[in-house]
Amino acid sequence: VSMQFNSIIMGLAGGERIFKLLDETPEVDDGYVTLVNAVKEGDTIKESGKRTGMWAWKHYHKDTGVTDYRELKGDVVFDDVDFGYNPDKIVLHNIKMFAEPGQKIAFVGSTGAGKTTITNLINRFYDIQDGKIRYDGININKIKKDDLRKSLGIVLQDTHLFTGTVMENIRYGKLDATDEEVYAAAKLANADSFITKLSDGYNTMLTGDGANLSQGQRQLLAIARAAIADPPVLILDEATSSIDTRTEKMVQDGMDKLMHGRTTFVIAHRLSTVKNSDCIMVLEQGRIIERGTHEQLLELKGKYYQLYTGNAMAQ
């Protein structure tokens, strides 16, 4: 009887969460700029009905009836951005930064410094209180949220896999992908070598959020999933902080190949993974207190030097 009672309680709790989700108010989205596949003919950008490897922002001007296109390059700018989960309590202050197309920008700092919050603003999980965030010169408030997020590839520390085959989990990044595209993405992510050793290879069934795989293997699948989506901008949120050093190298190699040619924002506790970044932003209490390359920040002998060397006496 007690077991049945516990099952009933668990069912009621689950039902309560489902009904709470159904009662949620849909997100307000005032965006009107959309993301489309495009081709370039001379100096003219045109919309394409099929995947071309080139993306463009489609801007329809209601006042003139004219539609223009702007190539998606991956230029991201934060201009004096303030943000607080509660408007009365600002947690990010005067954030200024720019990422040029193809650059790797790393955020480092203590827990709670604001690293993940910044990346959550890029994909508009939250809206800012002050300032502007521009994507290829377009205020992100003008971009439809679904299209904005479609342009971003996200690899998180906690990888979520669903019940299905390995191939289906990778293909989730691009539902119409061919088998050959899945194989290519897995090879780029360094996942092919372990997948082919599984009992049924790419047809191996995964259950329980991939419980039969190691943390490193799950992350390799997440990289493959991002690779097949072919996003122009990447967000890697502490993606190697939960695996052993040996596996980390394989994951990092896969990430390096994925990052090639893409604007990338990286958050990591292991500073060795961000040494080759074009710019490292050091955050403390919601402010950028240092910025520069690995070598430049070590020369400063400030907060980054302290984090990197473990020297608590660094000023």
Where are these regions (language model features)?
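Cytosolic ends of transmembrane helices, especially the final helix of ABC transmembrane type-1 domains
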Residues: 1-23, 30
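Solvent-exposed, non-transmembrane helices and loops of integral membrane proteins
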Residues: 28-39
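Flexible, glycine-biased helix-capping/connector loops in cytosolic signal-transduction modules
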Residues: 24-27, 200
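ABC-type nucleotide-binding domain
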Residues: 38-315
